[in-house]
Amino acid sequence: AEFAVYQALAAPCIEIIHATATPVDIQTNGAQTNGTQLWKVEVGIANTGWLPTVVSVRAERANMVRPLTAELSLPDGAEIVGGANRVKLGQLSGRSAFRHDGGAHNDGTPDRVLATWLVCCAAVPARRITVTVSHPRAGTKQQTVTVG
């Protein structure tokens, strides 16, 4: 039983570490916007597990694991004008890759990724956009952001 618990704790686990929607100021040059506004939706995703999302080097070499994906669910009257609705974000390393020797070497943040969309929708009334992040080995998470 102890071995099974250890394996479960080492498994990859995706988390949405931040999700924001910020209005984008655009120059309309006097054109009518019909009450719509442009929003920048950003989602930060991290693998908080010990193992990478691909789990093993062998699976990575054989390209056996589908990538992490992020997808938006939009309210009526909203549309994505920058980016695709479903975005493939690749694989994320886990905490096993972190250096613990105190060296000055910086590997960046291979355990994190940022997805960004531009969404056009009416600002009033407030509308909700649901972000779904999923990976076949690291799970699925959802979060809602409000525009307007």
Where are these regions (language model features)?
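C-terminal accessory segments enriched in acidic
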Residues: 1-30, 34-148
